[in-house]
A protein has these predicted regions:
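A conserved helix-loop-beta module that forms one wall/lid of the active-site cleft
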Residues: 1-4
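Phosphate-binding site of ATP-dependent enzymes
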Residues: 6-115, 141-143
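ATP-dependent carboxylate activation and anion-phosphoryl transfer catalytic cores
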Residues: 104-188
Length: 188
């Protein structure tokens, strides 16, 4: 991807291009070379009262954490970057990232990633459902890429739907629970 630069000359050239193309400052971040994950969170403190599947939700905080999905973009059309071009590919198609759900992670890392996603959801006051994208830094520490407060819901394609399917949650049940949670917020 052109957005990844390897030296100061490339950085200066790319920043100049961004500033000239978009007529605004450029954001420069350190590239995180570690594994990439996405973690879905659904619910709220009273989720069990509105859900058709109260057993999905944690007794302590009312949230459901979906299985962790790992994205491996090393063989995608944009190696090592989960770009729009890579996302546009269908699961399993040549040039698409590889998806592993549930991801094979150590129990301690699983706990960290799920807590990280939960905290991001809470801190942003997200409603009902969100999906947090996380990458590990060179020391293996989780770092926030972004939080999606309106995650995609395309069946057999969108990350949250792949996570739900990995634990046996039917697509219709996922959608209905999101709708029931939203309706409950409005007293419906």
């Amino acid at each position: 991807a052109k957005a990844i630069v390897k030296n100061e000359a490339e950085l200066r050239e790319r920043v100049k291009w961004v500033v000239n193309s978009y007529q605004q400052p450029a954001l420069v971040e350190t590239f995180l070379s570690g594994r990439e994950f996405t973690v879905g969170v659904m619910g709220r403190a009273d989720a069990k009262l509105y859900s058709r599947h109260p057993e999905w939700y944690d007794d302590k905080d009312g949230f459901h954490r979906f299985p962790i999905l790992e994205l491996d973009a090393s063989r995608s059309v944009t190696p090592h970057v989960y770009s729009q071009a890579a996302k546009a590919k269908n699961v399993g198609e040549k040039g698409a990232p590889d998806y592993f759900c549930p991801a094979e992670v150590e129990p301690e890392l699983e706990k960290k990633l799920k807590h990280f996603a939960y905290r991001a959801h809470i801190l942003l006051n997200a409603l009902d459902v969100s999906r947090t994208d996380i990458r590990l830094d060179d020391e293996g520490n989780p770092r926030l890429i972004e939080i999606n407060t309106l995650p995609g819901l395309t069946p057999d394609y969108s990350d949250l739907c792949l996570q739900a399917a990995a634990e046996g949650i039917a697509y219709n049940d996922l959608l209905l629970d999101i709708l029931y949670l939203a309706a409950g917020r409005w007293g419906l």
